[in-house]
Amino acid sequence: MQKLFREIGFACLLLVLALLLVFSLFWALSIGTVKLPVREIYETVLAQFTSGEPITAPGQGPVHDIVWLLRLPRVILASLVGCGLAVCGVIMQAIVKNPLADPYILGISSGASLGATSAILLGICVSLGPNFVGIAAFIGAFAISLAVLFISNLGGRSNSMKLLLAGMALSAVCGAFSSFIVYFANNKEGMQTIAYWMMGSLAGAKWGELAIIAPIIMASVIFFWTQSRVLNLMLLGDESAITMGTDLHAYRQWYLLISSLIVGFAVYAAGMIGFVGLIIPHVIRMFTGPDHKRLIPVSSLTGAIFLVICDGLCRIIIPHTELPIGILISMIGAPSFIYLMIKKTYGFGGND
């Protein structure tokens, strides 16, 4: 009976979060330089779905263009990136058994940024097609992921401190190379894009990007949710997992590959947005516990809500000016990271 009540409570929590996500989406659609009533937004979206017109077709009125071509792709991208980064944080923390792990802190986001910077300013990977920037960002993210694991295992078994130090060092290296490329690149338009993009922004969201990013992130989140048992075993350690008949080495490589894919395309679409993968999983773990069957769906919804709200705030904090979302997230995330670093019980179960 107690288990039944827990399952009902968990289902209610997911329902509440889903409703909060819908509410935050409509709120974000209504604010900005031009404020729109929620009813008008609802009617515009409903009319577009029932009209049969292509989703990118302009010229159906100013409200339609604002809602459908500018704001809706943006808020959907915010929810997808928030969802993906939060789940990546959960996975990274399970892989390295460190609740302070996060794609940004471990340097993976910086690797993706270096890959994307190289693609935009130097034309690297341009032969791979129209989505070459996303592919280059993924390659950079995955390469840094492997490098962090390799360096942290040098001179003995990896531990939390070695992982954090390796990630921070490689993040600095990637930042230095990115700055070097920007400094010497003879591409003014590309340099302006990179400068704004490194601060994080969802302003350039387009339906074409969503058609690529949405399936990748949603499929990855669902995949990780189906892997909850293996992720729970990772928290117990390799020896315990082997006694239960599971070798975690191959799983870590696959999870790292898929996480890098999410981070790469998130950085490609939204720029450098840090700390989402650190803050959200840690807060949610305090309510759901370390069980990934609960942690992953709750973190994904909360991450989506968090980034949608932050993006909305970036548009209204300073009148007539949009604050890059990476700045706001860092102002929230950096103090949170310091707090977790000095807190004595920041482990998966509160005792690590």
Question: Language model features by range: what are they?
Answer:
Residues 1-352:
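Alpha-helical transmembrane segments in inner-membrane proteins
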